[in-house]
Amino acid sequence: MSAIHEWGVAETARQLASKQVSSTEVTQALIQRCEAYQGMGAFVHFAPELALQSAKEADVRLGAGERAALLGVPLAHKDVFVTKTMPTTAGSRMLAGYQSPFNATVVQRLMDAGAISLGKLNCDEFAMGS
């Protein structure tokens, strides 16, 4: 079997649903991987404590037989998607310190499906690709 950090979303969800691994184990492995490569600047907001707490909650839900498409699957998203729990800059100094009162629809749908956020990923200004 490949290393946890090499699994895609579908494989991680499969492993969690079959109870081959816990969400806490997966989340800890990915946090360690992120910390090992922290110097790359991939994350503008890294939230390992929040992710571990969410993973523990997901493990309880999984243990109770609850099912959701992404229950317990850790992921990260670009800093252009607003969240209630983390500041959003969209890669722009103009938005430094902005805290949204709501989650972007895509973020909310991921959370509703049981996903766990490791944090927000860096991007060029407003993710314009320029």
Regions found by a protein language model. Give the residues of each.
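Hydrophobic face of alpha-helices
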Residues: 24-28, 52-55, 74, 107, ...
